[in-house]
Amino acid sequence: MASYNPGMRPTPASPASAAGSPASLSPISALSPLDGRYAGRLGSLRPLMSELGYMHRRVQVEIAWFIALSDAGFTEFKPLSPGARTYLLGLVKNFSEEDGEAIKAIEKTTNHDVKAVEYWIKSKFEARPELERAAEFVHFACTSEDINNTSHALQLKGAREQVVLPSLDAVIDKLREMAQAFADVPMLSRTHGQTASPTTVGKEMANVVVRLQTARERIAAVRLMGKMNGAVGNYNAHLSAWPEFDWEAFSRHVVETPEPLGLGLTFQPYSIQIEPHDYMAELFDAVARTNTILIDLSRDIWGYVSLGYFKQKLKPGE
């Protein structure tokens, strides 16, 4: 038997390596179908769940913490002027892709993504004496996870409120419309694949509407948690700086105060360095159960098509 000789079958160079540079990101060069084949359907999530969206939320958390510290009563950090507050909130509101690129450039030196955000914010204080004097209060007493866990929660909050629930509502509304339109259209039911008692097309759609409404309520009801209690969850650095201050109440205030001055999340009072993320498991499970309902619907529709109940609408070019 002839032995295999790797040298007999050289690996062909990829177009990218042949050209001497990486291929630019496009739907056909993306590693994931999320940014490839299905990019057009997920565009609304990109500003929320991308690294740019993550940076944006980190800036939001750092600014909210910084502004709150100015009102805490520190001798070294007087309350900020209305103009300074407006400027800081503008950094969040007007955060751009160019700002994200600037943070990535800083990260090349720091080799630390959260520290890069901190330095970028401080760079925006230049030529503003009021803010320059207080620059060292940016990220004061925080551990990186204080910024990260709250940023993740804000990302999920945005995705749920701006994309997931509106998309689910659109499906529910369409199915409800079909349930009403076809309420009197008879359809032969089946059990165990065999013909059974009659029903209506509208009733079958209504079944799914009720299931999806319940699933939607579960998704919407999940409390998105955030903690800001330091490196091991005990406010160690905070208490070293100001032992008499009620840091737990302060942290709760920042986490639960509505946006833009706070984060509009539910305060997590007990944790280690990381927020335990049980709420994420609850949220993702609720989404998964919703997807199961949609899979059931898709399979039922497939069955109805195979039985000749439904027929695909032809579109030019398809």
Residues covered by each model-derived region:
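Short intrinsically disordered, low-complexity coil segments enriched in acidic
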Residues: 1-3, 73, 265, 269, ...
